[in-house]
Amino acid sequence: VSALDRAGARKIDQTGLEDERRAAVHQALTDTQLKLIAASTKVLEERLQADPDLAQRALTAFSRAERQAENVEASLVLAIEDLKNKPSAGAEPADSPDTLDPEFLNRWELYASGATSEVVREKWGRILSSEIREPGTFSLKTLRVIDELDHETAILFQRFCQSRIGQWAPELLLDLDASELSALEQAGLILDAEFGRAVTFSQTIDGHGAKWWALGSDTMGVAVRQDPMPSTITTGPFNLDPLRIMDEKLKMNVSVLSRVGGALAVIIPHNEEEVFRRLAKVISGDVAGAAVMVRRTAEGIMSDDGSENAPPMPADGIVTPG
């Protein structure tokens, strides 16, 4: 960030002055600043020679500052690489700001300065590139939570995100026990697990007139055959099973990301198509084809096995109290 500031200052110095008079004033101020720095350096040098302890503290401080600058620069390089490798998919909104929030940049530089490992540098690099793509993704609170996240909780969250669909993950796919989910909740990454939440499938009909339950997005989803109904679906009053019929609707329990968790999930690679495929397999149980992953193609809606008689694309599920 500091390197960018210096580059910007040079650009202003070259093109930002309107006429020769202002350029002269600017240069005079620069010369004065350089003289003040030189004078300060001389005074500091004399003090260091007279006080060995001060010299040692100064050397330690300079070394620390140099390491911090290297950490920031390395994180910045990784952010630039990520932007080059993964350009924004859509057009930039008309109201998108031209510059990033200075408060965000200051806080990001503070945290990135402590990134001593390649993994942590990559994390802060992705955070910066994500914020550049979509300003406002990371609040100051989110940055603080991410900085304070311990290694064990970070690993748990990565496991959670491997089953993520949008802002939630199906309980059917989560390989996390109650204590691990509680750790994510206490870290502020998911919403309170005690209050059950569920998504509701919509009902649809395929080209042969067969009835299905469907859930997904504009591009892909999962469809569940109503007859015969998979054995993984349970029925009955006061039923809180992961996949159940309630009020004549198919509901599926999910764990939901918090705002902080949703922002952090953006920088964690995951394959949503593979998640839908896994979900279809789990729901099918011992009945092959009872649930299928579907996707939208140029030819229309296709099931994972290539069938063109897949049910219409479902709408994204709305999370409700279970």
What are these regions (language model features)?
Residues 4, 111-115, 127-131, 146-149, ...:
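Generic structural signal for hydrophobic core residues of well-folded globular domains
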Residues 138-173:
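Short amphipathic alpha-helical interface segments
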Residues 175-191, 196:
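Basic amphipathic alpha-helical segments that dock to polyanions
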Residues 1-16, 20, 27-29, 33-61, ...:
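Extended alpha-helical scaffold and adjacent linker segments that couple domains
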Residues 102-112, 118-132, 191-282, 286, ...:
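Accessory beta->alpha helical hairpin/"wing" motif in late/C-terminal subdomains of nucleic-acid enzymes
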Residues 108-112, 141, 145, 176:
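Non-transmembrane, amphipathic alpha-helical segments
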Residues 278-322:
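Long, low-complexity, charge-rich intrinsically disordered regions
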Residues 3-125, 304-305, 310, 316-322:
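Eukaryotic partner-binding/assembly regions in large regulatory complexes
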